[in-house]
């Protein structure tokens, strides 16, 4: 199982999904943040392929999932997480 990159608490990031879906809005992206005991601290569900998020304080790990919103076909290629610079 591939591992996700380590993220810094309170840092802003951009998640970019690379997939083709039919119909176009047939899938959502979910990112869930967990504390050291495995309890959910926060969840974010997005329709967009590219979105920003902040890694919450107190997070120990996180999980990225795809949720069906009625898609008929899905070709998943990759996703990336990049750190955003603070102003």
Model-inferred region functions:
Residues 35-37, 85:
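Solvent-exposed strand-loop boundary residues in beta-sheet-rich modules
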Residues 1-25:
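Extra-cytoplasmic beta-strand recognition segments
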Residues 13, 60-62:
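Exposed beta-strand face motif in extracellular beta-rich ectodomains
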Residues 57, 65-87:
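Extracellular polysaccharide-targeting segments
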Residues 47-49, 58-60:
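Ser/Thr- and Asn-enriched, surface-exposed coil loops between beta-strands
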Residues 23-35:
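Beta-strand acidic-aromatic groove motif in beta-rich domains, primarily in extracellular
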Residues 1-7, 39-43, 50-54:
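Beta-strand-rich interaction surfaces with strong enrichment in secreted/lumenal proteins
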Residues 16-20, 32, 65-67, 80:
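Residue-level recognition of well-ordered beta-strand positions that form the cores
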């Amino acid at each position: 199982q591939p591992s996700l990159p380590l993220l810094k608490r309170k840092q802003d990031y951009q998640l970019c999904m690379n997939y083709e879906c039919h119909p176009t809005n047939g899938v959502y992206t979910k990112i869930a943040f967990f504390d050291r005991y495995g309890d959910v601290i926060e969840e974010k569900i997005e329709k967009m392929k590219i979105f920003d998020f902040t890694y919450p304080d107190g997070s120990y790990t996180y999980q990225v999932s795809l949720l069906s919103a009625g898609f008929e076909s899905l070709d998943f290629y990759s996703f990336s997480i990049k750190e955003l610079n603070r102003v």
